[in-house]
Amino acid sequence: MDKKKLSHSSLQSSVTSVLAALLCILIGLIVGFLVLLAINPAHAWGDGFVRILKGGFHDAPYGVGKELANAAPLVMTGLSVAFAFKTGLFNIGAAGQYTLGAYGALYCAIMLKMPWFVCLLAATLLGGIWGAIPGFFKAYFNINEVITSIMFNWIGLYLVNELVYQNGTGPMYDVRNTRTLNLSKNPAFAQSIIPDFGLNKMFQTNSTTIAIFLAAAVAILIWVVLNKTTFGYELKAVGLNKSAARYAGINEKKNIILSMAIAGALAGFGAGLYFLSNVSQWNPLNSTSLPAMGFNGISVALLASSNPIGTIFSALFISHISVGGSFLSTKYYPTEISDLISGIIIYLCAFSMLFRGKIHGLLFKNADKTNVNAEPAPAKTETEMEGK
């Protein structure tokens, strides 16, 4: 009976979380449309709102392929933030971990000419190491992981830029394009590019690979680890109450470091998916801004309520409206309008707890009441009482 009640409660929680996220999206889109009206009323509907809603389908199949290529790293950075949050930590250092992952993947591809899966492993390893450092400071010195991870974002950016650029003489650096060497333009790097299995032809792009399927598989794996394994239970127990976890014999210091290391590894893996799909090349001259994928991962995790499976769908949605925004005519609207709508939706996600409470009250108010018609538990007999 207890298991049945627990399962029913979990189902209610999942339903309310999904509906709350959909409500956030709906309100965000409405507010976004009002902004479009305020900027340019004449083109707010057809050339603005509808084009954003169509996303990549406005220029299918190319646009859809672009959505999938951008969604893969978003799933991973969203997982990075969500995993840490599930274990009681806030990983705002996904951008730095993503940066180190990008370097690991590109170094293995360009300098060592390794197969793509080895390059992905290097990206995962470097991201994990970079994530473990704030975890170490949190575990042994109780230094807030938000502060240390922000600092390591910038340290990672400048370190990677210097390693790639080397005053313009770096072996990974293409002086003419001011970026790392393009993997697709050199046959020597062919084995380092993630295979597409015909997806590039299907979507008429050069960057649509199996990356999105790899990201989805990792998301499912993380859900299984968190919900179906003893290791996942220990991680969540430490996040909920370190003192209680310690009393239960769980090594909270080890688990804090592991949580941040895994979160960093996920972000690094996402960078590998992005750069080994040849979506873009690394620009070491960009020293003023961190990779947007890292911070967009926070948006993905918030919209998904930190559910690993939910990050797949929230990443696809964020990618969808971002690509839709890129198709807006600059005569009428700035391309950043899609980022504005995303920001509004994520801002509303801060109220998702309120929305979930209201939705739960509307849908399940009768289900939560005690069933007065249920048979009461049988009373103990005098013999049973005396036996005690």
Language model features: what each stretch is:
Residues L36-L37, G55-M111, T124-I143, A244, ...:
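Single transmembrane alpha-helix segments in multi-pass membrane proteins
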Residues M1-I25, A38, L240, Y247, ...:
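Cytosolic-side transmembrane-helix boundaries in multi-pass membrane proteins
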Residues N153-N227:
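Transmembrane helix-bundle core of multi-pass membrane transporters
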Residues A20-L37, L74-V81, A102, L106-C108, ...:
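Hydrophobic core segments of alpha-helical transmembrane domains in multi-pass membrane transport
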Residues D2-M76:
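Membrane-interfacial amphipathic/re-entrant helices at transmembrane-helix boundaries
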Residues L266-G268, L273-G343:
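Transmembrane alpha-helical segments in multi-pass inner-membrane proteins
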Residues F83-G104, L226, F231-E234, S329-P334, ...:
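Cytoplasmic juxtamembrane regions at transmembrane-helix boundaries
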Residues I129, S192, D196, F203-Q281, ...:
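Helix-loop-helix "hairpin" substructures at the membrane interface of multi-pass membrane proteins
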